[in-house]
A protein has these predicted regions:
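A structural motif corresponding to the C-terminal end of an alpha-helix
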Residues: 121-132, 162-164
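Asp-box/WD-like beta-propeller blade repeats and closely related beta-sheet repeat scaffolds
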Residues: 18-121, 134-151
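Short loop/turn segments that connect beta-strands within beta-propeller blades
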Residues: 8-11, 64-68, 127-130
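Beta-propeller domains
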Residues: 1-17, 152-173
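Short strand-connecting beta-turns/loops that link adjacent beta-strands
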Residues: 10, 36-38, 128-129, 165
C-alpha cells in the first residue's frame, strides 16, 4: 500500500512518502501524524526483517516527510498518544486470527495462539526510544471479572484509544 498525504494548500496534491506491506482493510497501516513532535512526522506499521522481535516481522516506522529521515521502532502501533511521546501496541497476528480485517497475516500462518498469555497484551512503547513495557496482559484481562464461559476463548483487544491529555486509555476486551 502507498502511504502519503494530500497537500490541501497546493491543490490537494497527493505526496507519496513510502510503501508498506503491513495493511488491513479496516485500519490500513495505522498511519498517524505525530503532532507532538517537531516538523512534519508520521508513523505507520510495516513489515520488517526483524525475526527476533516481540512480534517477528512487524514494527513501525517514523518518517520526517520533509527530510525523508526514517527510523524503525520494534513494535507495530495501534494508537499514538496525542503528545506523540508514546504508543500502545498489540500483536496484529493475534488480531488476524480473531478478526481478520483488523490484523496482519503472516507467512505460513495463521498459527495457533495461547489463549490468554501472561507475557502479551497491550504494550506501552516510547516513540523516541522504542522501549516497551507490558501494561495489561491477556491473562490479567481474562481474570478481571472472570467468566468461565471465556476460559477456552482466545483473548484480544480492539478500539484502543487515548484521551486528549494522553493520561488515560480505553479499549474493548
Amino acid at each position: 500500500a502507498s502511504i502519503g498525504y494530500f497537500d490541501t494548500e497546493n491543490g490537494d496534491r497527493f505526496h507519496a512518502v513510502v510503501e508498506t506491506g503491513a495493511w488491513n482493510w479496516q485500519m490500513g497501516s495505522q498511519l498517524q501524524w505525530l503532532d507532538g513532535l517537531e516538523g512534519r512526522q508520521l508513523i505507520h506499521n510495516d513489515r520488517t526483517a526483524d525475526s527476533g522481535g516481540r512480534y517477528p516481522g512487524f514494527g513501525s516506522v517514523v518518517i520526517d516527510v520533509d527530510s525523508g529521515e526514517r527510523r524503525t521502532l520494534p513494535m507495530p502501533v495501534y494508537v499514538v498518544a496525542p503528545s506523540s511521546a508514546w504508543a500502545l501496541c498489540v500483536d496484529y497476528r493475534r488480531l488476524y486470527v480473531t478478526h481478520e480485517t483488523i490484523g496482519y497475516s503472516e507467512e505460513g500462518g495463521p498459527f495457533a495462539l495461547p489463549l490468554a498469555p501472561e507475557d502479551d497484551g497491550i504494550w506501552h512503547m516510547e516513540v523516541a526510544t522504542g522501549e516497551a513495557r507490558l501494561l495489561a496482559s491477556y491473562a490479567r484481562l481474562k481474570a478481571f471479572h472472570h467468566r468461565t464461559s471465556m476460559d477456552k476463548a482466545i483473548h484480544w483487544v480492539s478500539h484502543i484509544e487515548v484521551n486528549p491529555s494522553s493520561s488515560r486509555i480505553l479499549f474493548l476486551h
